[in-house]
């Protein structure tokens, strides 16, 4: 059995599924660490500190942000979020930033509210699909 993603990805995916949200790991052909059908991409960061810098994280941090920005511009219905596990214990969510500026613990949203929003959207989508059938 091969590993798919980091520990933080696995933990978040489990939390989403337990919350009743359909979600799956991303793949090379589908960008993002976690995909929530039909149009949500979640990118996960797991810094040891209480902030995450796209520039100092690695050479790919800013390039990855740019690639996701281009994808979002090409497909405006895509919703992209960052979920960060700060200092390996405190989870926060962020809307996709307009610039690759640092993400800070005190500026992030709580996961419960984020999960509620995602579940309501999926529930509404399922009701809409049932009506169409």
Regions found by a protein language model. Give the residues of each.
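Short, charged, amphipathic alpha-helix that recurs within catalytic cores of restriction-modification
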Residues: 54-79
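Domain-level recognition of nuclease-like catalytic cores that cleave nucleotide substrates
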Residues: 3, 79-80, 84-133
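Acidic-basic catalytic patches of nuclease active cores, encompassing PD-(D/E)XK
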Residues: 1-25, 30
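Conserved catalytic cores of phosphodiester-cleaving nucleases, focusing on short active-site segments
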Residues: 16, 34-36, 40-50
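A short, conserved, highly charged catalytic patch centered on acidic carboxylates
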Residues: 22, 28-30, 44-54
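Short, surface-exposed beta-edge/turn micro-motifs
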Residues: 31, 38-39, 78-81
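Short acidic/glycine-enriched loop/turn segments that link adjacent beta-strands
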Residues: 28-31, 88-90
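Acidic-residue sensor for enzyme active/binding pockets
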Residues: 9, 43, 64
């Amino acid at each position: 059995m091969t590993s798919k993603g980091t520990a933080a990805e696995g933990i978040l995916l489990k939390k989403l599924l337990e919350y009743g949200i359909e979600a799956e790991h991303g793949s090379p052909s589908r960008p993002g660490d976690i995909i929530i059908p039909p149009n949500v991409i979640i990118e996960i960061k797991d810094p040891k500190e209480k902030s995450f810098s796209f520039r100092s994280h690695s050479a790919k941090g800013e390039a990855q942000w740019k690639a996701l920005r281009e994808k979002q511009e090409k497909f405006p219905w895509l919703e992209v979020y960052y979920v960060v596990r700060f200092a390996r214990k405190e989870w926060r969510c962020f809307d996709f930033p307009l610039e690759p500026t640092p993400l800070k613990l005190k500026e992030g949203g709580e996961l419960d509210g984020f999960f509620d929003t995602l579940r309501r959207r999926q529930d509404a989508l399922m009701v809409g699909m049932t009506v169409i059938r």
